[in-house]
């Protein structure tokens, strides 16, 4: 035993074991011991000689490995298999080669051992021999080489050699004289002649390359009468093209000729599978050869010969000719050539395969790898089963073994049974499973498992998911498949005999139904090529009857043309009824049909090629339809299955029906195309109409066009039954029509959904517009012909983001307005087309901006919201136009731009005039402003002062920025123009400031930039708004600096210049909205901003977050509202401001901080409230991140931002600001009124405003110094105006509407988390709110609640709300007109007062900003629902009413707003708090209450 156990070292394998006491275990144990007597005794008991151990090793393998010659002889004599595969793929031949014993190896080779086999590592016996060591390997390798040489000589015709050397034993070198005695078996003696009855007896020889014999004395043949031929004997036919097709993952079959016989040769093809072991895969052919040599059946592909290469390394199998190819290629790769498989053909093919499978089972074989690859269609209607390389053979012990250990390729998992995939024992039930899968595949035209990768299928099965029967299967076949696809083998109750019985009965019934049609010969026509899809159904190509003979011969002629014309990877193409390009089909040879069909074919192929996923008619559906047609042909009254319409009457009626159906199909096609166009236009980027859907649609649409070629080719169908033809066409057309109907239904559903979305967006926009109009009470002031916009060039009109922003912000009203005009007509996603369009306008606006900034601002601003006025005008016009002219968006927007430009110019002059008029009132306003400033300062000092929404403005800017962000390209240009305008404005401001004085320059610049920059800056205002905000902080900084030094003024000029540049844009937009002219408020806004900067410093991050949230909310709103656009623009601006302005402010922040510290000191010296006022009116000038940094850098600053841009002189600033504010209020009210009134009016007002702005710009040049201070105001005004655009037109209306709407809006827009976070942040950083503020907050809450109710009512009554808002706006506009006129008169009177008014205006603007943030908040909220919009609108209406009342008292109201002492101011702080812009504690309380509400 010890001797037997000792293995040669190094041994390539280990020996397995058997742990039981069975005879097999004893046999293995005795073999290891080398006990010949006991082994023979056990063998005599009839034990299974090839019983395996734990490693799959047989007793013969162990004996050969250990070199036990006698045991090998006895085991072979008892029938041990020399080629039995161990689990590692090795065979006893490998073991013998390793043992180094030539006798053992020769014995195994004589018994049929094969030297070509490989183990799982690709090692053949020669490799094993070399592993044994040089001493033993040399002899073994030489022996194997002699065997190979002998075999080669025999193959080459030297058969006489067999007479001398008939056994490998005779090739052993150094055979002992008494070798026969040494073998232990007289039959194994190499010296004795072969004797009949033994393995090497008679004519059977084996030299390690398969058992063969000589036929006719010379021809070498393998067992099974398989001639062994050389490679040169198989050649390509010269009368047919090369035709190759895949017969599985690793095999390729090629049509060749052997000795004049047309054959198909199978060979290994691993080029596409480089990771597979070519050496090991070669064993597959050997295994199939051995299996095929034992099988003979009419439906098993007949192996005719074996082709060996000269070096015996390569084997090719020669089969009978396969004319068509595999079933897989017919169903999935070349379906165009076989548009329809008749049902009787399908059943006939399935019966043939089931017969062959039953034959295999009867012989003890299990196919295991049955798939559509293994079914070869040798000719029309004739199928053969092949691919036997993975087949397993039953053994005596009942187990099955395969000739190779090659695992089943994952590519075949789609058809394999679960037990085969997970490598468990396979049975005949496994083949039934695979057969059921094929039945489903051929009837549904779908690859099993939808073509999933094998590895995925295996994972799916392991996870407990299995393939299920397709419910589309016909009844009898559904039962078959359902039973066969059961997971457990025992549940597959149907056997092949049952399946065959069901199929035969079904075929009989089917054929019996067809016998009434003598003209029908579907079987002959089964595989005809049909370039015309209309004849697909019957496979009745419209060729003359000669085509029935199109069988093998014609298919041969087509040859490789058949091969996968659609590509190997387009299995789904099969589903398309479209025929291949006519050239592909032999039928194409008929030119008359070619000409007729080629157009349709080309279209069909084009339709197919785009999407392999196209799901046109499935073959089984066509088959059913065809079957139904056959039935209906017999019984015209019977309905075609699945068509739902009875085909009645004679051929004439059918012809009429066919024509009518074709016409209907064409109509449907056009409708589908139209709907598709609409759908595409409605959303260029919309994925609702996916590419697959589109391709599928195209595919289906192509089919209706085919009837025309079919009609053209009708002449060729003389020999066919007209009834059959018409029925086929009608059925196909009906099926296509059904498909088109489904497509149309889907498209209509998608379009309807989009339309509903657009309607909702439009409603929201309309509500927002009305809300916005109501908030912009100045819209009602459109009556006043002169625009009283802020003179400061730095004035930043509320950026009403134009279509670009609107596009950017699907929720923004502005976006929606501009977008809706485009979107409505196009049905495009509101943001997509309009976005693209707006981007284009924006680019154009860039160029235009360079040419004419005013004009560019208008044009660009519109796409970019660069010009709030133009945006507002366009928005109003869009709001008005969109409903009436959804498709006129470009027109309306263009007019909006033009009108914006014109109105900007005219309004500029008007604003300047109003400014002059306001200068007169400047003194009073200034005084009031001072008083208010003092009050506000006191409040700020005590922590009770409500900080103007510098953050709100930033929030608005952020929102608008967010909106602009959606329009990045336009935004960039806008920013560029903005910077250009800003620089120019800054330069101009510097010039004007130097000569004219800060206040005067501020006014002049304000007006000038408003007018002059209004056009370009309208465009830039969108971009500039961010700089403007940046500049605004600079402005506040500059105002302080201006009071401190001219350098600060210059800085403010540069900053304001940008701001004013933005502001003119904004003012242009605002002129459209009329809110843009809130420069005074802008100044006031700076004051507020100063306060808010304090708040920002304390809570700017939260505010930023809040603003970001507002921006996020505003974006949805922006699409619906200009307010949102303004907010979006503001958001962009504030983002830009936050980035450039606030970040720059960061650098300036230190200076600003110093400036703030110093100016506040001076202010404190003058008036302690000035610091608070500065806090309110000044804005930190950090351009890059001052906004964020301010909040972070100076969280503990009481109220002043790091840098104050508000002039130190509260009186002059307040007067100027008041004048500006009044002018702006009146102008914005006019614009708002105009916008709400009509697009044309708003456009005209925009034009007028543009003109005014132009004149104002020109005048502003002289007022550069004033503009410095006023620029800051305009910047804030721009923000405020933006806010007014959202909230109200006038500062008062803004203050009121924003207060109420802000509270409600903030409540709605601010998320609880955000509010809580902001509140907490503010709580941490800010002092507790005063009782007065709390009271105000409660009052505001009540107003909000009422406004919410109003909003709901408004939502239900948006029209009335808009009217009310317009009315309120008009009222406010009148009051604002008065105020603005007074303010402008005052401004004209006193430049210093203008500066002061600018401050006051800034304060007022700050108030407006504070309110606009609410609007901004409302805007974000508005997207949440029309109710909110309505409520915001109602709130704004109420606020506007209050504003109108206050506007009647412009001086009084302004000071209040500026100082924040007024009730509005208190409300504003509440709103600010809610927004998180004001003191955190207040905000927290308001936010919490709002949230709780």
From Swiss-Prot:
Q: What ranges does the record list as Polar residues composition bias? A: 559-573, 855-904, 1001-1020, 1053-1064, 1131-1144, 1343-1362
ANK repeat start and end residues:
27-54, 55-84, 88-117
Residue numbers covered by motif D-box: 846-854
Give GO MF terms, alphabetically.
Answer: ATP binding; protein kinase activity
Task: Establish whether keyword Nucleotide-binding is in the entry.
Answer: yes
Motif window: GPPX3Y: 789-795
**Location of Phosphoserine modifications:** 430, 560, 660, 1100, 1262, 1400, 1492
Q: Give the domain of life.
A: Eukaryota
Ranges of compositional bias, category Acidic residues: 1066-1075
Q: Provide the protein's localization.
A: Cytoplasm; Midbody; Chromosome, Centromere, Kinetochore
Biological process (GO), any one: male meiotic nuclear division
Q: How does it assemble?
A: Interacts with KIF23 and RBM44. Interacts with CEP55; inhibiting interaction between CEP55 and PDCD6IP/ALIX and TSG101.
Quote the PANTHER family the UniProt record gives.
INACTIVE SERINE_THREONINE-PROTEIN KINASE TEX14, TESTIS EXPRESSED GENE 14
Per the entry, what this protein does is:
Required both for the formation of intercellular bridges during meiosis and for kinetochore-microtubule attachment during mitosis. Intercellular bridges are evolutionarily conserved structures that connect differentiating germ cells and are required for spermatogenesis and male fertility. Acts by promoting the conversion of midbodies into intercellular bridges via its interaction with CEP55: interaction with CEP55 inhibits the interaction between CEP55 and PDCD6IP/ALIX and TSG101, blocking cell abscission and leading to transform midbodies into intercellular bridges.
Q: Which family does this protein fall into?
A: Belongs to the protein kinase superfamily.
This chain belongs to the protein called Inactive serine/threonine-protein kinase TEX14
* Species, as recorded: Bos taurus (Bovine)
The encoding gene is TEX14
């Amino acid at each position: 035993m010890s001797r037997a156990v000792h293995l040669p070292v190094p041994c390539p394998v280990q020996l397995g074991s058997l742990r039981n006491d069975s005879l097999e275990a004893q046999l293995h144990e005795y073999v290891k011991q080398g006990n010949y007597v006991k082994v023979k005794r056990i063998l005599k008991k009839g034990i299974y000689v090839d019983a395996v151990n734990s490693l799959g090793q047989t007793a013969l393998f162990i004996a050969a490995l250990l070199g036990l010659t006698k045991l090998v002889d006895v085991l072979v004599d008892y029938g041990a298999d020399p080629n039995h595969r161990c689990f590692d793929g090795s065979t006893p031949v490998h073991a013998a080669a390793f043992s180094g014993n030539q006798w053992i190896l020769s014995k195994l080779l004589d018994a049929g051992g094969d030297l070509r086999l490989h183990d799982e590592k690709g090692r053949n016996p020669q490799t094993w021999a070399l592993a044994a060591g040089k001493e033993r390997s040399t002899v073994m390798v030489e022996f194997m080489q002699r065997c190979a040489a002998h075999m080669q000589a025999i193959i080459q015709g030297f058969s006489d050699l067999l007479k001398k050397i008939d056994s490998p034993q005779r090739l052993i070198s150094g055979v002992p004289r008494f070798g026969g005695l040494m073998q232990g078996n007289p039959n194994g003696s190499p010296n004795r002649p072969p004797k009949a009855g033994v393995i090497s007896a008679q004519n059977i020889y084996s030299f390690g390359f398969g058992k063969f014999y000589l036929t006719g004395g010379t021809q070498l043949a393998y067992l099974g009468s398989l001639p062994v031929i050389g490679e040169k004997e198989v050649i390509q036919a010269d009368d047919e093209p090369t035709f190759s097709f895949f017969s599985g993952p690793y095999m390729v079959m090629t049509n060749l000729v052997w000795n004049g016989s047309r054959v198909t040769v199978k060979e290994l093809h691993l080029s596409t599978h480089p990771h597979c072991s070519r050496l090991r895969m070669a064993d597959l052919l050997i295994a199939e050869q051995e299996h095929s040599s034992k099988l003979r059946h009419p439906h098993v592909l007949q192996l005719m010969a074996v082709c060996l290469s000269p070096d015996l390394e390569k084997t090719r199998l020669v089969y009978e000719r396969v004319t068509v190819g595999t079933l897989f290629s017919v169903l999935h790769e070349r379906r165009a050539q076989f548009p329809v498989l008749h049902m009787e053909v399908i059943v006939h093919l399935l019966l043939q395969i089931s017969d062959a499978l039953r034959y295999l089972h009867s012989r003890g074989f299990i196919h295991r790898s049955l798939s559509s690859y293994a079914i070869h269609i040798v000719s029309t209607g004739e199928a053969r089963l092949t691919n036997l390389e993975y087949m397993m053979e039953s053994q005596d012990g009942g187990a099955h073994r395969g000739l190779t250990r090659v695992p089943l390729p994952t590519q075949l998992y789609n058809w394999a049974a679960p037990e085969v995939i997970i490598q468990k024992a396979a049975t005949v039930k496994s083949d039934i499973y695979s057969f059921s899968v094929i039945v489903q595949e051929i009837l549904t035209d779908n690859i099993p498992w939808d073509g999933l990768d094998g590895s995925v299928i295996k994972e799916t099965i392991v996870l407990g998911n299995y393939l299920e029967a397709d419910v589309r299967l016909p009844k009898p076949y559904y039962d078959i498949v359902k039973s066969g696809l059961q997971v457990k083998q025992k549940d597959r109750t149907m056997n092949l005999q049952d399946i065959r019985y069901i199929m035969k009965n079904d075929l009989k019934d089917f054929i019996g139904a067809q016998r009434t049609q003598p003209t029908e010969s579907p079987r002959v026509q089964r595989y005809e090529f049909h370039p015309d899809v209309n004849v697909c159904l019957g496979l009745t190509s419209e060729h003359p009857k000669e085509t029935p003979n199109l069988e093998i011969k014609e298919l041969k002629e087509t040859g490789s043309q058949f091969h996968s014309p659609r590509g190997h990877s387009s299995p789904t193409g099969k589903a398309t009824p479209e025929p291949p390009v006519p050239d592909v089909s032999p039928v194409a040879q008929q030119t008359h049909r070619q000409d007729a069909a080629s157009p349709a074919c080309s279209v069909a192929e084009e339709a197919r090629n785009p999407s392999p996923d196209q799901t046109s008619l499935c073959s089984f559906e066509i088959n059913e339809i065809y079957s139904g047609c056959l039935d209906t042909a017999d019984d015209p009254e019977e309905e075609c299955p699945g068509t739902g319409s009875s085909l009645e009457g004679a051929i004439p009626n059918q012809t009429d029906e066919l024509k009518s159906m074709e016409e209907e199909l064409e109509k449907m096609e056009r409708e589908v195309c139209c709907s598709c166009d609409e759908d595409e236009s409605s959303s260029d980027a919309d994925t609702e109409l996916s590419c697959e859907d589109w391709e599928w649609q195209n595919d289906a649409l192509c089919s209706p066009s085919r009837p025309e070629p079919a009609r053209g080719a009708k002449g060729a169908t003389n020999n066919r039954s007209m009834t059959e033809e018409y029925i086929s066409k009608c059925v196909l057309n009906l099926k296509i029509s059904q498909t088109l109907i489904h497509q149309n239904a889907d498209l209509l559903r998608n379009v309807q959904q989009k339309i509903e979305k657009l309607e909702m967006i439009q409603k929201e926009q309309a509500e927002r517009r009305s809300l916005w109009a109501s908030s912009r009470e100045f819209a009602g002031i459109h009556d006043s012909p002169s625009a009283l916009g802020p003179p400061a060039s730095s004035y930043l009109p509320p950026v009403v983001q134009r279509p670009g922003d609107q596009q950017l912000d699907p929720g923004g009203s502005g976006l929606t307005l501009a977008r809706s005009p485009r979107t409505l007509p196009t049905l495009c996603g509101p943001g997509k087309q309009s976005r693209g369009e707006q981007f284009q306008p924006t680019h154009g606006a860039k160029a235009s901006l360079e040419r004419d900034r005013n004009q560019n601002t208008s044009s660009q601003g519109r796409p970019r919201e660069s010009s709030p006025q133009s945006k507002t005008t366009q928005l109003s016009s869009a709001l008005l136009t969109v409903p009436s002219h959804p498709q006129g968006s470009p027109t309306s927007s263009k007019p909006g731009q033009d009108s914006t430009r014109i109105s900007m110019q005219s309004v500029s002059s008007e604003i300047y005039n109003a400014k002059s008029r306001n200068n007169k009132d400047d003194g009073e306003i200034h005084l009031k402003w001072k008083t208010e400033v003092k009050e506000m300062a006191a409040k700020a000092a005590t922590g009770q002062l409500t900080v103007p929404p510098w953050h709100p403005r930033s929030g608005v800017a952020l929102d608008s920025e967010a909106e602009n962000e959606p329009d990045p390209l336009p935004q960039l240009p806008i920013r560029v123009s903005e910077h250009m305008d800003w620089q120019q404005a800054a330069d101009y401001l510097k010039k004007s400031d130097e000569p004219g004085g800060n206040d005067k320059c501020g006014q002049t610049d304000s007006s000038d930039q408003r007018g002059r920059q209004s056009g370009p800056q309208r465009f830039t205002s969108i971009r500039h708004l961010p700089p403007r905000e940046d500049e605004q902080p600079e402005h506040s900084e500059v105002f302080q600096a201006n009071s401190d030094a001219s350098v600060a003024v210059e800085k403010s000029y540069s900053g304001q210049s940008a701001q004013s540049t933005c502001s003119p844009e904004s003012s242009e937009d605002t002129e459209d909205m009329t809110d843009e002219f809130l420069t005074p408020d802008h100044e006031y806004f700076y004051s507020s901003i100063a306060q808010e900067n304090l708040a920002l410093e304390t809570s700017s991050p939260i505010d930023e977050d809040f603003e970001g949230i507002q921006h996020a909310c505003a974006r949805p709103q922006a699409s619906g509202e200009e307010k949102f656009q303004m907010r979006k623009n503001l958001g962009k601006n504030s983002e830009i401001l936050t980035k450039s302005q606030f970040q720059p402010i960061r650098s300036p922040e230190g200076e600003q901080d110093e400036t703030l510290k110093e100016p506040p000191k001076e202010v404190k010296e003058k008036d302690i409230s000035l610091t608070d006022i500065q806090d309110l009116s000044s804005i930190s000038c950090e351009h890059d991140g001052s906004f964020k940094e301010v909040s972070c850098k100076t969280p503990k600053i009481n109220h002043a931002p790091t840098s104050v841009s508000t002039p130190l002189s509260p009186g002059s600033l307040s007067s100027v600001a008041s004048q500006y504010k009044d002018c702006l209020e009146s102008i914005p009210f006019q614009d708002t009124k105009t916008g709400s009134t009509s697009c044309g009016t708003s456009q005209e007002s925009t034009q007028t405003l543009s003109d005014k702005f132009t004149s104002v710009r020109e005048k502003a040049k002289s007022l550069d110094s004033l503009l410095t201070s006023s620029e800051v105001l305009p910047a804030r005004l721009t923000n405020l105006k933006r806010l007014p655009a959202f909230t109200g037109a006038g500062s008062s209306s803004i203050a009121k509407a924003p207060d109420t709407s802000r509270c409600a809006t903030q409540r709605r827009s601010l998320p609880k988390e955000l509010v809580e976070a902001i509140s907490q942040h503010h709580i941490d950083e800010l002092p507790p709110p005063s009782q007065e503020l709390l009271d105000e907050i409660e009052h505001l809450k009540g107003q909000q609640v009422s406004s919410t109710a109003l909003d709901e009512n408004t939502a239900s009554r948006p029209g009335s709300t808009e009217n009310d808002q317009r009315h309120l706006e008009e009222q406010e506009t009148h009051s604002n007109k008065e105020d603005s006129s007074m303010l402008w008169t005052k401004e004209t009177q006193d430049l210093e007062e203008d500066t002061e008014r600018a401050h006051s205006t800034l304060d007022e603007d700050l108030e407006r900003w504070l309110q606009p943030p609410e609007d901004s908040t409302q805007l974000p909220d508005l997207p949440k629902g029309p109710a909110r919009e309505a409520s915001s609108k109602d709130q704004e209406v109420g606020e506007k009413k209050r504003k109108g009342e206050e506007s009647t008292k412009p001086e009084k109201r302004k000071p209040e707003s500026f100082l924040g002492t007024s009730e509005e101011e208190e409300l504003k702080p509440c709103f600010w708090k809610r927004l998180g812009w004001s003191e955190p504690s207040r905000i927290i309380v308001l936010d919490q209450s709002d949230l709780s509400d």
